[in-house]
């Protein structure tokens, strides 16, 4: 019979993810080792393997949680806009503000999502649900869902300006403006994420 998880198991996994995300952002996913992550966590490599069986498992859990968070943020922002009776442009502004606030607190996770999805396995994994999908495809599908949601918000906000031929370019231009803020917009700097939004 398997031993039950301790009450702090999930808290420790969360802490590992925070530290691993920082290691991946600082050194890159390929360069960061399980030994370095364990050292940064103040634990042994063996103890780290108690929580995650591989570096890729850490990366997947990090991206799995983060992409779920982004999708939840979209749903929450949409519900808030409806409850407050915001017009479509104000709702888009709220969505952009919500993304930027999330990016401010999740910069290292965002770096991993932008740079490291390619390192996830493309082998189908039956543990990820039905239909069977690979870890990489699951994360890419969620990224596509985020992009599609923002495209819909843009089309609602600017119905006369967005159409089938330009919506992808305009959506990606918006993401280009906000996705890379972590490279130049610093918390505590002369302009805040909230002011930028």
What spans do the regions from the language model cover?
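Short, basic, alpha-helical segments at the C-terminal edge of helix-turn-helix-like DNA-binding modules
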Residues: 64-70
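Short, well-structured alpha-helical segments
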Residues: 93, 164-175, 194-197
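Amphipathic alpha-helical segments used for helix-helix packing
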Residues: 103-134, 183-184
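Amphipathic C-terminal alpha-helical segment
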Residues: 101-105, 109, 152, 156, ...
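Short coil/turn segments at alpha/beta junctions that flank glycine-rich nucleotide-binding fingerprints
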Residues: 26-30, 106, 160
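Helix-turn-helix
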Residues: 4, 11, 15, 19, ...
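Amphipathic alpha-helical packing segments from all-alpha helical-bundle domains
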Residues: 75, 123-159, 168-172
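Hydrophobic alpha-helical connector segments
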Residues: 61, 75-108
């Amino acid at each position: 019979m398997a031993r039950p998880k301790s009450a702090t198991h999930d808290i420790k996994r969360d802490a590992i993810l925070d530290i691993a995300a920082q290691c991946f952002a600082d050194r890159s996913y390929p360069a960061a080792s399980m030994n370095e992550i364990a050292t940064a966590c103040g634990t042994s490599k063996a103890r780290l393997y108690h929580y995650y069986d591989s570096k890729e498992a850490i990366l997947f859990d990090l991206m799995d949680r983060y992409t779920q968070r982004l999708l939840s943020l979209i749903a929450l922002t949409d519900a808030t806009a409806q409850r407050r009776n915001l017009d479509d442009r104000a709702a888009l502004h709220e969505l952009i503000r919500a993304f930027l606030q999330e990016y401010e607190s999740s910069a290292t996770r965002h770096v991993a999502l932008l740079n490291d999805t390619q390192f996830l396995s493309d082998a189908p994994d039956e543990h990820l649900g039905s239909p069977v999908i690979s870890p990489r495809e699951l994360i890419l599908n969620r990224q596509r869902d985020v992009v599609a949601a923002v495209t819909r918000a843009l089309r609602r906000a600017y119905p006369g300006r967005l159409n089938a031929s330009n919506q992808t370019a305009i959506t990606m231009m918006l993401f280009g403006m906000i996705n890379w803020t972590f490279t130049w917009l610093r918390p505590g700097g002369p302009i805040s994420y909230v002011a930028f939004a």
